[in-house]
Amino acid sequence: MNVLPAASQPLNQSVTLCVDAPMRLDSGLELGPLTVAYQTIGRLNAERTNAILICHALTGDQHVIGPHPVTGRPGWWETLVGPGKTIDTDRYFIICSNVLGGCLGTTGPKEINPATGKPWGLGFPVITIGDMVRAQALLLDHLGIERLFCAIGGSMGAMQVLQWAVSYPERVRAVVPIAGSWRHSAQNIAFHEVGRQAIMADPDWNGGDYLNQGTVPRRGLAVARMTAHITYLSEPALQSKFGRKLQDRASITYGFDADFQVESYLRHQGANFVKRFDANSYLYITRAMDYFDLAAEHDGVLARAFQGTKVRFCVVSFTSDWLFPTAESRAVVRAMNAAAADVSFVEVTTDKGHDAFLLDEPEFHDTLQGFLDGAADMFGLPRGLFSGIRP
């Protein structure tokens, strides 16, 4: 077993914010106090200029590296983050927070509503990607970080980092949106609606009050996960891994058990997911993604969202990603070009589908490495291990 040096050991913490004044949400409602759970890795340099914010995807959380507290599995981006890796914890100070509305420590529908002493459930206000980013900005205030070196995220994380560039352009030097888009498509909203309806149709959902009723809508949440997981893959990857191979049997059973390996795989994904994720959080976070549209506040003209920005961008897409296809990333790049923004674009050739950003994909890793090294050199960040603080 490889033991990480002390500076690269993850620190898992939480902080209560907005104690004196609530945070105003995009809906017009207010929320506070709110708790943000987060992980940090590495050391913040004396100038506080080497911080990277990693934004997680829909079903992710703050545990980028290290054993997950619920599943015991490795962190979701250990392929990329660590000493000497692409996102080098000897050089950068890494922050990742559980998003607002999440279910691993940050205020969300699973947590206790201080006004009632019971879980929020559907009493929790509907949130947006903008609200998630607003909470992250408050966390950075708490950590004493005025400006990020870089914000990086895939899928829903890409939405967050783009929102960072639009809402707080003066607080981030570089942004890397991976396998994302500037708005959620009709097809993706449709897939989310199928998942939400599966959850809400489960009798154990109890109108969203299942935690107070002592039930969990496991079946509905599992189906939602199974449906969504298909969109994270690709037909070539499914064909290569499963094809029409049978699951532990010599012939079909003429029944409705999992005859095919792909059926068994999806059932396994659903069963594992319900052990670590909250059903109401799934409703709220998918809705936040559906509402995401960077052009909405700019008369439908995306380029205006990036007008005058000094942020340096690297936009990454994958050839086999049909959830957020390359055309979506190209639209973002064209808008940035129209706004005279500093942007690089790379389409990575892979058959691994949308989830390629989570996997061992050398071309993607090399792309990210090159961009980070170039940006770090431009902004004067030193290479190698240095002493610093762990706020």
Curated annotation (Swiss-Prot):
Record flagged with keyword Protein biosynthesis: no
Domain called AB hydrolase-1: residue spans: 50-360
Keyword set, alphabetical order: Acyltransferase, Amino-acid biosynthesis, Cytoplasm, Methionine biosynthesis, Transferase
Gene Ontology BP annotations: homoserine metabolic process; methionine biosynthetic process
GO molecular-function terms, A-Z: homoserine O-acetyltransferase activity
CC terms in the record's Gene Ontology section: cytoplasm
Protein origin, superkingdom: Bacteria
EC number annotated for this UniProt entry: 2.3.1.31
Family named by the database record: Belongs to the AB hydrolase superfamily. MetX family.
Subunit structure: Homodimer.
Annotated protein name in UniProt: Homoserine O-acetyltransferase
Species annotation: Rhodospirillum rubrum (strain ATCC 11170 / ATH 1.1.1 / DSM 467 / LMG 4362 / NCIMB 8255 / S1)
